[in-house]
């Protein structure tokens, strides 16, 4: 029975027993901060077990996606360890109990999937006579096949708990140990656990006593992959049809054979398991990052990439495997099938990023371990582990795994200290930035009622500060902070800059440069006395720069529209990671895994402008946080909210919690234009945009530019693009002609270099120092040289390209590759002599070095490497 058929058979069987079949829940727990990822079938159903939520049915069955990474280092080294797996389960919430659970488990195993009854064994809790009798008297399980084990009791601290009963499959004495009393519960591989039935019937009290539960529950779990291995007669889960096609695809890519080399098999299993894991995680919305679930994903993905390198795979290989994973799991898991392209884009982006630093990081680590070994040390310093993490993207667990393969451990405390030091530096930098404007002690204002009202135009001065000093009077030229009783100025927050304007008193004027808020909420104004003086107690006029505020309102509302448009075009994984709203432009940082394409940018810009043209009135209201959540409001990055929140809604398009300035109608934004998009960190992108007059001015600038180009190209503006294509085509044709001339020159050079051909055994080998101005020329020479050898042999060419640069290219014909020669090894040996490195495919590789003077020595080293391979 195929794995997908087994899943379907299980779910259909329990549907026939009155269970509601639910699709697998996401791997991301919903409203459960105690869990990082779902690791068991019952985990997403916990609210039903605890009574917090009423289940849609008192009988439920699922095939739940699960993720466990506690034993990551064992994955690939044992028959059963996985990160990702599916847990088949049937559950009862105060409905049926022990007898039915046991009867149905036995019926499914023996009648539906037809396992041999004589090879099934069960264990029960010693005091659970009801379970024992049900197995023996009702199901007919022989007493010799029932074992009482103290371990068969499920509990985690106080709360619901109860005995459980495990079902085992006897794999045969050849899998067992020498103990004549070997039975279920033994540590050997003979008895394989395939199903666990948990009978939740007690409540453990604080004093350690157990009281019967009023409503008893059933929680069962059977690993799909494990059950499939039994049905398909496989030695390990990895050989089932749920996983083995991924191993086959990986082996083909690496040019290796499964089940020939134990170390190779470990890497093949690791990659197969991890390909399933990253597919499931990303399809559920997890993206690579350096914390939380994102770190789990990054750690698994990069571990897979590293094992690909151990197999000799160069370049991208994990991304194509996603197609194989989807072919297997897609029919049974909708989310995986629906997100195939999205998953591949995320994996390719992360794979490319790690490949850029992997080789350097591995070299550094191996060199470091060599040095430590020479010094008789056995611990990799924490500072070096941190360097690999910070500079080369090595999760510390990956460094630990590589180190352990060579008999080393890592200094965990030193690594944590280095991490803490980096965080402290970042925190101090933030504190320094925040402390640029000092304010005096304002505790004397604690009994004052300070208000904010944008309609107010007059108030009184409560406090003046200069640095940390409180002033009674500030004179012309003083840079000060001012607190008034009621202010119409908006404080900086939510990414929006603070208001500017003037505070005008009877004796002078203060120009307000910015408005901020102290941690406890008091609004203060930062400014300079530009006329006369100002004193505490003065009655003052408050003049906000309303034109500037209106410009920020346009940009702030446009930011909300942009956020919503990003989610609609790129996906719901997009979240705000920072923002800046100024009068002149807006900046928006968001989580996304790859550069946004021009087509996507065009869609985003068009969506925002469509909302502007709809002239929609904004709905702005205060409400409870629960009400806001019910409306689907998005909370913004870095903001903290009280019980009552302000909700800004563009009906039908965007709902966010926000305290900033906004237009009353989207039409007031006038126009929206994207100006840039770029990455600013791992998994974080930045968009900048303009609105209103600035957007219109930019459009005018573009029009004038096109008109000038039309003049230069001697055409009219509407035909500029067509004419430009003509000019570029002509230039391309000229370049092709020049390239043909260059190739003819190279062909002549190729004829010269094979004059130095030597035979290593029956293999023709050419190593030559040539003149070339680019790596493309070197590749051409190598190609032509191999052609001159009648397509059989090895060509290694090198060229100095400046005082401190030398490049190499190696080509190996397929028949010589079959003899064990790999271009990557040959070119690497050459480049290392010249102070460099490189690699590539078995048939073609290139490398670079820093010491052109050693070119001839390097070519000789390449020949020596080939000789050692062939002999």
Report the location of each language-model feature.
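A glycine- and charged-residue-rich anion-binding loop/surface
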Residues: 1-871
């Amino acid at each position: 029975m195929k794995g997908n058929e087994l899943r379907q058979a299980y779910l259909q069987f329990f549907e026939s027993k009155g269970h509601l079949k639910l699709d697998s829940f996401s791997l991301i727990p919903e409203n459960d901060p105690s869990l990082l990822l779902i690791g068991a079938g019952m985990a997403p159903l916990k609210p039903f077990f605890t009574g917090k939520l009423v289940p849609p049915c008192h009988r439920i069955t699922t095939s739940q996606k699960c993720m466990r990474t506690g034993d990551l280092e064992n994955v690939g080294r044992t028959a059963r360890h996985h990160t990702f797996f599916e847990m088949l389960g049937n559950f009862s919430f105060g409905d049926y109990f022990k007898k039915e659970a046991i009867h149905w488990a036995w019926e499914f195993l023996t009648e539906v999937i037809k396992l041999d009854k004589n090879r099934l064994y069960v264990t029960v809790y010693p005091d659970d006579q009801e379970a024992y009798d049900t197995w023996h008297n009702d199901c007919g399980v022989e007493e010799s096949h029932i074992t009482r084990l103290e371990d068969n009791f499920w509990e985690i601290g106080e709360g619901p708990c109860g005995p459980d009963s495990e079902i085992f499959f006897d794999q045969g004495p050849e899998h067992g140990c020498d103990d004549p009393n070997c039975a279920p519960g033994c540590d050997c591989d003979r008895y394989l656990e395939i199903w666990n039935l948990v009978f939740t019937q007690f409540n453990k009290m604080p004093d350690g006593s157990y009281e019967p539960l009023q409503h008893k529950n059933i929680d069962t779990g059977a690993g799909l992959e494990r059950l499939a291995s039994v049905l398909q007669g496989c030695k390990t889960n990895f050989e089932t049809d749920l996983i083995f096609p991924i191993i086959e695809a990986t082996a083909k890519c690496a040019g290796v054979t499964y089940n020939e080399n134990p170390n190779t098999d470990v890497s093949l299993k690791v990659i197969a398991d991890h390909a399933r894991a990253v597919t499931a995680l990303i399809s559920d919305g997890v993206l690579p990052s350096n914390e939380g679930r994102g770190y789990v994903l990054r750690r698994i993905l990069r571990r897979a990439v590293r094992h690909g390198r151990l197999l000799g795979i160069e370049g991208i290989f994990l991304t194509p495997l996603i197609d194989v994973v989807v072919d297997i799991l897609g029919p049974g898991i909708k989310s995986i099938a629906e997100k195939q392209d999205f998953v591949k884009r995320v994996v390719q982006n992360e794979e490319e990023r790690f490949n850029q630093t992997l080789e350097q990081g591995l070299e550094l680590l191996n060199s470091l371990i060599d040095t430590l070994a020479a010094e008789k040390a056995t611990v990799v310093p924490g500072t070096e582990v941190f360097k690999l993490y910070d500079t080369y993207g090595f999760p510390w667990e990956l460094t630990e795994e590589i180190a352990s393969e060579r008999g080393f451990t890592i200094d965990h405390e030193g690594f944590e200290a280095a991490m803490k030091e980096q965080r402290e530096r970042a925190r101090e930098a933030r504190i320094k930035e925040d402390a640029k404007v000092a304010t005096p002690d304002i505790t004397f204002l604690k009994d004052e009622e300070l208000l904010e009202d944008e309609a107010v135009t007059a108030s009184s001065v409560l406090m003046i500060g200069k640095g940390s000093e409180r002033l009674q009077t500030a004179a012309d030229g003083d840079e000060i902070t001012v607190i008034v009783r009621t202010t119409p100025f908006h404080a900086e927050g939510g990414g929006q800059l603070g208001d500017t304007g003037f505070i005008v008193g009877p004796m002078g004027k203060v120009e307000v440069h910015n408005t901020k808020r102290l941690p406890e909420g008091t609004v203060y104004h930062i400014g300079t006395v530009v006329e006369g003086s100002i004193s505490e107690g003065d009655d003052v006029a408050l003049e906000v720069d309303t034109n500037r505020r209106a410009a920020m309102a346009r940009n702030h509302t446009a930011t909300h529209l942009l956020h919503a448009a990003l989610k609609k075009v790129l996906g719901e994984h997009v979240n705000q990671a920072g923002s800046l709203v100024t009068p002149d432009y807006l900046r928006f940082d968001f989580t996304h895994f790859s550069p946004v394409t021009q087509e996507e940018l065009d869609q985003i810009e068009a969506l925002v402008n469509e909302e502007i043209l709809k002239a929609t009135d904004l709905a702005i209201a205060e409400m409870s946080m629960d009400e806001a959540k019910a409306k689907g409001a998005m909370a913004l990055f870095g903001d903290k909210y009280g019980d009552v929140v302000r909700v800004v809604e563009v009906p039908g398009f965007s709902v966010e919690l926000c305290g900033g300035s906004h237009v009353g109608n989207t039409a007031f934004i006038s126009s929206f234009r994207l100006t840039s998009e770029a990455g600013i960190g791992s998994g974080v992108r930045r968009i900048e945009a303009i609105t209103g007059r600035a957007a219109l001015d930019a459009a005018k600038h573009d029009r004038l530019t096109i008109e000038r180009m039309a003049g230069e190209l001697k055409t009219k503006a509407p035909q500029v693009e067509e004419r430009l294509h003509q000019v570029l085509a002509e230039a391309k044709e000229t370049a092709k002609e020049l390239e043909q001339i260059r190739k003819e020159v190279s062909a002549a050079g190729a004829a010269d270099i094979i004059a130095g051909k030597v035979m290593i055994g029956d293999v023709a080998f050419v190593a030559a120092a040539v003149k070339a101005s680019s790596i493309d020329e070197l590749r051409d020479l190598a190609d032509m040289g191999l052609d001159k050898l009648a397509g059989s042999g090895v060509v290694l060419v090198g060229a100095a390209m400046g005082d401190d640069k030398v490049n190499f290219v190696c080509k190996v014909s397929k028949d010589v590759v079959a003899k064990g020669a790999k271009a990557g090894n040959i070119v690497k040996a050459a480049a290392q002599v010249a102070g460099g490195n490189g690699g590539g495919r078995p048939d073609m590789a290139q490398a670079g070095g820093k010491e052109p003077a050693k070119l001839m020595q390097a070519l000789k080293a390449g020949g020596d490497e080939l000789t050692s391979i062939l002999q």
